[in-house]
UniProtKB/Swiss-Prot annotation:
One of its GO terms (molecular function) is ribonucleoside-diphosphate reductase activity, thioredoxin disulfide as acceptor. It comes from Equine herpesvirus 1 (strain Ab4p) (EHV-1). The record marks Y765, Y766 as: Important for electron transfer. It comes from the Viruses. Keywords: ATP-binding, Disulfide bond, DNA replication, Early protein, Nucleotide-binding, Oxidoreductase, Viral latency, Viral reactivation from latency. This is Ribonucleoside-diphosphate reductase large subunit. NCBIfam families: NrdE_NrdA (TIGR02506). Substrate binds at T208, S223, C224, G254, N436, L437, C438, T439, E440, P621, T622, V623, S624, S625.
Length: 790
């Protein structure tokens, strides 16, 4: 079958499009680099090989010519089309695609309409997708488009078709969901069109599991699982791994696993404490990821008073003393009570002898406490002598930071903030004990149910109103477009929640009872650049808050409308803060609302009718999904203006197209443009490093990277929008080493203290270090980085 398909004649339309793109390359002045030509009447295989040679030849030139980056992306899409099957029914019947029977039936029932929609897509949205760039095209080709036998691959239209059809079917099952999604006439074609337009137009970007498995009889659609089993020894741990963690990992779900109650210190008969369990989890994760499919991961959650905390912090990389305790395939997160930072602040204020006490399982009840109750019980246990060890608070802080910088773990979250701002009063239920793999999901998990979250993000550059070329208008942010996108995303994720199957009974129970949404954003920095705003400017900071507020408002409004139209609120609504008329931002002081009247009306509606979902907004990292949009990741500034990574298949390049186009506009002479790019290259693509401190308003001054912004400003921007992010934000720190290569731990701790004082829930996801040298060493009280996580 492979020989027959790939050796068949390539469709003439594809050949003509390939020739057109190659002509454009010649027009750009690169004809001499195209050493080969297509043979007459080429086969699909010959066209594939030709496109690959052209792209591989021109890829290095993308560093200096953004037009080639776009054309190479268009060529990769032509490579995709060369492998597409024109017969829709072949795709429908493919055993590799394994379409769900319900999805297949819906497509066949509306086949004429769908074929017209796909034809229109080919001549409109698809052209825009093809012009995004090389990384977008490669990500679709290599990861998201399902593969079939004989070298075939599903088309872009078929990809969006299976997602839109799946969502449409489960939306149509509930008339209220359909009525919230579209105004006016409600019918299958109207619902499908709404979803297909949002997906194909890249306004709504589903999470990776939905893109991979949506509409198919394989995989799970949920992204995040939070597990809090009652694990106190190896027997209970093995049971939890086999019954819960194993099935979830095999379904490619990411896990956050609370293990604080496994707190028996090393002793006779138990020589390695919790480290033996962590080694087992590490090996399990490595084995499951060895098949080459979508990798998954585990983050284990511990509080900093755990008896084995120092061993946990030394389990990765060069900090591990030997292979028996090395756990490079999992991450750790410090689930940190306020008391820890209060004591560290006392040390900063000059108090001597401030200690931090470690406890074993005699203090396991501290897991269930937070706030004043935790503080009083912790200090009582100290006074009663139950501690197993005491460490100077600054030494404990140093160990945490050293591990984060040298190994990428631990992450750090603030236990009290996560519990205080939750939508239930947890003093009756017991405290939340952990988050998910990426530190943005806040849910109460216990022995009876897992926390589960289904994710999607809004591509903010698609919410800009862009005036036609050669007109006097300027771009502006369209809040109405964001509001529509938020409502669509709310119904879409609810539909996918209903469509999904879950690996374990406890996971299914968590979905059924909480209906937790995780709606986030991507392309915040890209949107600011398109609006000609520096990310740290007052205008950008104001817009940053307004975006989060509108996202929460319209998502909650859609959820409340579902209940007003007859759907039942989530289980436990009557016991939640929502039933009292409290909204997520009410627990934050001094919040200014841009939509005060809308919130007042919504507050009344929620009290009267309820909320279908219990949670709404989570600012997740969008590492993979933002590659298909060519937007900046999540809410972070870009890490670099030219991403370059060498992989087994060659170099991956992703230039900042907005920067490249700006340089072309201000340096119209080719020699001047190339000189500017050469200067940038020597400065590691730092505009500041290449051209110095440019005046405010200069066309290049806004192109700073994450490492060039004051990290306190980025933390403040997280705090500004925190009242409207009812879950959390995967906030990373971006630190540049000093020229001498010595990075004091106190510098990073000062940022964590700032995040704590600003009331964030996540203090540090990754600590990304831009190295000054490659000769990092560890001396005295200073940290010198030894790895770079770019």
């Amino acid at each position: 079958m492979a020989l027959n398909f790939l050796q068949s004649d390539c469709p003439l339309a594809i050949i003509q499009d390939v020739i057109s793109r190659v002509d454009a390359i010649s027009d750009y002045g690169y004809a001499n680099e195209l050493s080969t030509t297509l043979p007459p009447r080429p086969s699909r295989s010959q066209v594939l090989e030709y496109i690959t040679r052209v792209v591989d030849t021109l890829k290095p030139r993308c560093r200096v010519d953004e037009r080639l980056y776009v054309v190479c992306g268009e060529l990769v899409h032509l490579r995709i089309r060369t492998r597409n099957v024109e017969d829709l029914k072949y795709w429908l019947n493919s055993t590799e695609i394994a379409l769900n029977e319900i999805v297949e039936k819906d497509i066949l029932d509306h086949l004429d309409f769908i074929q017209r929609t796909l034809h229109a897509f080919e001549s409109s949205e698809y052209r825009e997708l093809c012009a995004l760039g090389l990384q977008s095209a490669l990500k679709y080709e290599e990861m998201y488009l399902a593969k079939m036998r004989g070298g075939r691959i599903e088309s872009m239209g078929q990809f969006f078709l299976r997602l839109a059809t799946t969502a449409t079917h489960y939306t149509m099952e509930e008339p209220a969901m359909a009525r919230v999604l579209v105004s006016g006439e409600v019918g299958w074609t109207y619902i499908f069109k709404a979803y297909f337009t949002a997906l194909a137009g890249q306004v709504l970007i589903p999470a990776t599991p939905i893109m991979l498995f949506g509409g198919r009889d394989c995989g799970s659609l949920a992204s995040c699982y939070l597990l809090n089993p009652r694990v106190t020894d190896m027997n209970s741990a093995m049971l939890a791994l086999m019954e819960e963690a194993g099935p979830i990992l095999c379904n490619r779900g990411g896990i956050g696993l609370s293990l604080q109650r496994f707190n028996t210190p090393p002793k006779e008969g138990c020589s390695r404490g919790v480290m033996a369990l962590l080694k087992l989890i590490d090996s399990m994760t490595m084995a499951i990821n060895s098949d080459g499919e979508r990798p998954t991961g585990v983050c284990v959650y511990f509080e900093p008073w755990h008896a084995d905390i120092r061993a946990i912090l030394n389990m990765r990389g060069m900090l591990a003393r030997d292979e028996t305790v090395r756990c490079d395939n999992i991450f750790a997160c410090m689930w940190t009570p306020d008391l820890f930072f209060d004591r560290y602040q006392r040390y900063l204020d000059g108090e001597s002898g401030v200690m931090w006490t470690l406890f074993d399982d005699t203090a396991s009840h501290l897991c269930h406490m937070y706030g004043k109750e935790f503080e009083e019980e912790y200090e009582r246990l100290e006074q009663c002598g139950f501690g197993v060890d005491s460490i100077p608070i600054q030494d404990m802080a140093f160990i945490i930071v050293r591990s984060a910088v040298m190994t990428g773990s631990p992450f750090l979250m603030f236990k009290d903030a996560c519990n205080k701002h939750y939508h239930f009063d947890l003093r009756r239920k017991g405290a939340i004990m952990g988050s998910n793999l990426c530190t943005e999901i806040i849910q109460h998990a216990d022995e009876t149910q897992n926390g589960v979250c289904n994710l999607a993000s809004i591509n903010l550059p698609k919410c800009l109103a862009i005036p036609p070329p050669h007109t006097a208008g300027v771009p502006y942010f369209d809040f109405a477009a964001l509001g529509r996108a938020a409502a669509t995303a709310t119904i879409f994720v609810n539909s996918m929640m209903r469509a999904g199957t879950y690996p374990t009974v406890k996971s299914q129970r968590g979905v059924d009872e909480n209906r937790s949404l995780g709606l986030g954003i991507q392309g915040l920095h890209t949107a600011f650049l398109m609006l000609d705003l520096d990310m740290a400017s007052p205008e950008a900071r104001q817009l940053n808050k307004q975006i989060a507020e509108r996202l929460l408002l319209n998502s909650m409004k859609a959820s409340a409308t579902l209940c007003r139209l007859g759907m039942k609120p989530f289980k436990g609504f009557e016991d939640s803060k929502y039933s009292l008329g409290e909204l997520p931002f009410d627990s934050y002081p001094g919040v200014t609302l841009a939509n005060r009247n809308a919130w007042r009306r919504l507050r009344t509606e929620i009290k009267q009718h309820g909320l279908y979902n219990s949670q709404f907004v989570a600012y997740m990292p969008t590492v993979s999904s933002s590659q298909v949009t060519e937007s900046s990741e999540g809410f972070s500034p870009v890490y670099t203006n030219l991403f370059s990574k060498v992989t087994a298949t060659g170099e991956v390049l992703r230039p900042n197209l907005l920067l490249m186009r700006t340089i072309r506009s201000i340096f119209p002479r080719e020699c001047a443009r190339l000189q500017a790019l050469s200067t940038l290259e020597m400065a590691q693509w730092s505009v500041v490093g290449a051209f110095g401190d440019l005046p405010v308003g200069h066309p290049l001054s806004k192109f700073k990277t994450a490492f060039e912004y004051d990290q306190r400003t980025l933390i403040d921007m997280c705090a500004d929008r925190a009242p409207f992010v009812d879950q959390s934000q995967s906030m990373s720190l971006f630190i540049t080493e000093p020229a001498d290569g010595k990075l004091p731990a106190s510098k990073i701790m000062s940022l964590l203290v700032h995040a704590y004082k600003r009331g964030l829930k996540t203090g540090m996801y990754y600590c990304k270090i831009k190295k000054a040298t490659n000769n990092g060493v560890f001396v005295g009280g200073d940290l010198v980085c030894t790895s770079c996580s770019l």
